[in-house]
Amino acid sequence: MLSWVVTFLIIALIAGILGFGGLAGASVEIAKIIFFIAVILFVVSAVVGLLRGRTRV
């Protein structure tokens, strides 16, 4: 649980530096790209999980 606290603290510090440093526009675009990559990976993972689950049954 402590590792999650440290992880979110680091993310918050980086977001604060980028937000208050004037790089908010660039960080928004990067966040959009990372979000869509994460959604695509989630969908691929879900489909692969469903296909593997059906073959074992």
Swiss-Prot record:
Pfam families linked to this entry: DUF1328 (PF07043)
GO cellular component assignments: plasma membrane
Protein localization: Cell membrane
Superkingdom per UniProt: Bacteria
TM region positions: 4-24, 30-50
Membrane topology according to the record: Multi-pass membrane protein
Lineage of the species this protein comes from: Bacteria, Pseudomonadati, Pseudomonadota, Alphaproteobacteria, Hyphomicrobiales
Keyword annotations: Cell membrane, Membrane, Transmembrane, Transmembrane helix
Protein family according to the UniProt entry: Belongs to the UPF0391 family.
Name of the protein this chain belongs to: UPF0391 membrane protein Nham_2738
